[in-house]
Design a protein with these regions (language model features):
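Helix-loop-beta segment of a Rossmann-like dinucleotide-binding subdomain
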Residues: 84-102, 141, 225-229
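Predominantly flavin-linked oxidoreductase catalytic cores and closely associated redox partners
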Residues: 114-254
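N-terminal FAD cofactor-binding segment of flavoenzymes
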Residues: 43-81
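Beta1/beta-strand and adjacent pyrophosphate-binding region of the FAD-binding site
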Residues: 2-15
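Glycine-rich FAD pyrophosphate-binding loop
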Residues: 24-44
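Conserved Rossmann-like nucleotide-cofactor binding loop
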Residues: 15, 38, 166
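FAD/FMN-dependent oxidoreductases across multiple families
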Residues: 235-292
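Short beta-strand to alpha-helix junction loop
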Residues: 92-113, 168, 233-238
């Protein structure tokens, strides 16, 4: 089966769904595909800064984020080793008087639903297996396998890869890395219930960081991060050991509060990848978000 579009976007998370939404609102015929089921979580931090909240307001989606129960953030506290904490109030500006950190299964769903309302054809549980090309070699869409196992060709004038750091679109289009970083951070995080937080809280220690991110359903995300080598060494004694050791060493004041809170999820981990920039466009294709 073959269907034609102006644009097909691969990846229906924040970057891809937003791209599809804006293109559809501008009048383009857009298909949006993602291999994951609709409304699922993904490995991610999700603390939005003012620019992100402003965009949601401009797109008419901020009220839905607020209605989802995401905690309003009106203060950020910075904790430093051997120093007093620094509190910064979030000033009202541009129609935004608070920041928000909605869970990804909440935020992604809100943006995807808005894209559908704008006319985007969304296909979840659709795995991209190949890029299509015309007789000149220009990228001309994607071939996907849908949830029923059927192969479907989605032909498009432009194919947008929004499929993350391991982008299949980037690899198959022949995108090359133009700049490569040398540093990386390994992260562990978990959600806690009934954990009092004044807003965003960031703590900085020796080659490590930690923090609190209030989110939906009265929960707070707690993360720790350090170099990949240090994280690997600590995890030899177990992931829980690594999490608690880093939290106590980096942010003892935060660790005291975590000790009396109730875990609301398992630990999630990210091994760390050095940052990079890829060539973000070519004949018939472009990259957005982490893909580029």
């Amino acid at each position: 089966m073959t269907t034609g579009y102006d644009v097909v976007v691969v990846g229906a998370r924040v970057a891809g769904a937003s791209t599809a939404l804006l293109l559809a609102r501008a009048g383009a015929r857009v298909a949006l595909v993602d291999r994951a089921p609709y409304g699922t979580d993904t490995l991610s931090t999700h603390a939005l800064m003012r620019a992100g909240v402003l965009q949601l307001r401009r797109w008419g989606l901020l009220d839905e984020v607020i209605a989802s129960g995401a905690s309003p953030i009106r203060r950020t506290t910075f904790h430093y080793a051997d120093s007093k904490s620094l509190e910064v109030a979030i000033r009202a500006d541009g129609g935004v008087d608070a920041l928000y950190a909605p869970r990804r299964q909440v935020l992604d769903r809100i943006i995807v639903d808005a894209a559908v309302a704008a006319g985007v054809e969304v296909r979840h549980e659709a795995l991209v297996t190949a890029l299509l090309r015309d007789n000149t070699g220009r990228v001309a869409g994607v071939r996907v396998t849908d949830r029923a196992g059927r192969a479907v060709d989605l032909r498009a004038t432009v194919t947008v890869g929004a499929d993350g750091i391991r982008s299949a679109v980037a690899d198959n289009a022949g995108s090359t890395v133009t700049r490569q970083g040398r540093s990386a951070s390994a992260i562990l995080y978990r959600y806690y219930a009934e954990l009092p937080a004044t807003g965003y809280e960031w703590a900085y220690g020796h080659s490590a960081a930690a923090g609190f991110i209030p989110t939906n359903e009265g929960c707070t995300g707690v993360f720790v991060g350090t170099t990949p080598a240090r994280m690997r060494a600590l995890r030899r004694d177990g992931t829980e050991h690594a999490f608690q050791t880093l939290l106590a060493a980096t942010a003892p004041r935060l660790a005291e509060r975590v000790a009396v809170a109730a875990p609301a999820s398992r630990l999630h981990g990210w091994a760390g990848v050095a940052g990079f920039l890829r060539r973000p466009y070519g004949p018939g294709w472009a990259l957005v978000g982490d893909a580029g």
